[in-house]
């Protein structure tokens, strides 16, 4: 029996000194089947990545792929995952794309989802499909799947169970509040290009823009309960997620521009969700930021409060999250 046809997918993967985890990921992508392209952006790894070495470590099926299946481009200096993803996207020729991290693991459900999307009438002409994932922070708790906050939002949206289904505006306003990850979505390449959607070229928080503008500008969103990717959480080491410096404050001009774009869209549901997201993120940044950088954070927070937080949102924040405002210096 022949295997049902699948979407043609490209995988774009930034990598900085992660060859040991990248090679197994490349091997898994070769085995899964729907990946027509794998584009790796070497973000100034030391030593540099080499296709032959990676394919040797990735296994027999990866080595049997066509010569142009794996493409590696290199940044001479580290520019971050956002710039790497943007470069990778510019080279995609497949009609659909997924952005993966070099230490992610992909599961058979991802290939099944690609086949679902190719054959289910409800999925025709989708702009992106958001799917579920497993976060390894749950391993110690013997929990499989997403973190409780994200899982609760999926349940509130009525989408926690069901292999494939369209996402309405009210449901989108809930799912947009999930963690701003790039690797839990399959995008239509033309959608990203037509709308000018990409990542922010920052070292940290570079996926916020991709996440929110995708939800804002998509005409057709699909959701799937399939768990397609394992997100490996590494609380120690030199990973960008573990860097808590003033560079995180560079996100605030991006947040300001996003708030303006969302406000002009006449989507009050997304505006409320985004405002709540910004204040939660600012509080998280403040909890990890060195004391000498907190006055700058408070200045950014005060500016966002005055210019981007409408009166009704201020009232709700004062009533429900007064302690948060105190921590951010909002009187």
Predicted segment positions?
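Membrane-interface aromatic/basic loop that binds lipid-linked glycans or pyrophosphate carriers
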Residues: 1-5, 31-35, 60-70, 83, ...
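Short aromatic/hydrophobic "clamp" motif used to bind/position activated sugar donors
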Residues: 97
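A conserved hydrophobic helix/loop-capping motif in glycosyltransferases and polysaccharide synthases
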Residues: 9-21, 25, 32-33, 41
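Glycine-rich, basic loop-to-helix element that forms the pyrophosphate-binding segment
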Residues: 75-92
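Donor-binding/catalytic cores of nucleotide-activated saccharide
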Residues: 102-205, 209-224, 230-247
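Cell-envelope/extracellular polymer assembly enzymes that use nucleotide-activated donors
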Residues: 7-10, 37, 209
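Acidic donor-binding segment of Leloir-type glycosyltransferases
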Residues: 26-74
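C-terminal subregions of glycosyltransferases and related glycan-biosynthesis enzymes
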Residues: 223, 227-331
């Amino acid at each position: 029996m022949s295997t049902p046809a699948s979407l043609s997918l490209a995988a774009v993967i930034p990598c900085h000194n992660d060859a040991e985890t990248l090679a197994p990921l490349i091997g898994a992508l070769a085995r899964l089947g729907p990946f027509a392209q794998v584009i790796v952006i070497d973000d100034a790894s030391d030593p540099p990545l080499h296709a032959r070495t990676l394919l040797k470590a990735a296994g027999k099926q990866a080595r049997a792929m066509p010569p142009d299946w794996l493409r590696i481009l290199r940044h001479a200096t580290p520019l971050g995952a956002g710039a790497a993803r943007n470069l990778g996207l510019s080279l995609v020729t497949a009609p659909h794309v997924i952005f993966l991290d070099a230490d992610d693991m992909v599961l058979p459900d991802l290939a099944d989802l690609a086949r679902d999307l190719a054959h289910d009438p409800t999925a025709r002409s989708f702009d992106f499909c958001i799917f579920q994932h497993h976060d390894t922070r749950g391993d110690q708790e013997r929990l499989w799947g997403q973190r409780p906050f994200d899982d609760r939002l999926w349940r509130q949206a009525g989408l926690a169970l069901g292999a494939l289904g369209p996402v309405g505006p009210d449901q989108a306003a809930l799912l947009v509040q999930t963690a701003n990850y790039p690797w839990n979505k399959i995008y239509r390449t033309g959608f990203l290009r037509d709308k000018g959607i990409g990542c922010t070229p920052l070292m940290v928080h570079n996926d916020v823009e991709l996440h929110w503008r995708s939800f804002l500008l998509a005409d057709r969103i699909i959701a799937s309960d399939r768990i397609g990717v394992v997100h490996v959480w590494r609380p120690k080491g030199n990973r960008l997620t573990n860097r808590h410096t003033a560079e995180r404050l560079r996100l605030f001009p991006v947040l300001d521009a996003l708030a303006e774009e969302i406000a002009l869209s006449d989507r009050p549901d997304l505006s409320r969700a985004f405002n709540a997201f910004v204040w939660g993120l600012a509080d998280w940044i403040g909890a990890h930021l060195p004391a000498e950088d907190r006055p700058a954070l408070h200045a950014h927070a005060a500016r966002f409060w005055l210019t981007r937080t409408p009166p009704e949102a201020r009232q709700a924040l004062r009533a429900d999250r007064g302690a948060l405002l105190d921590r951010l210096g909002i009187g």
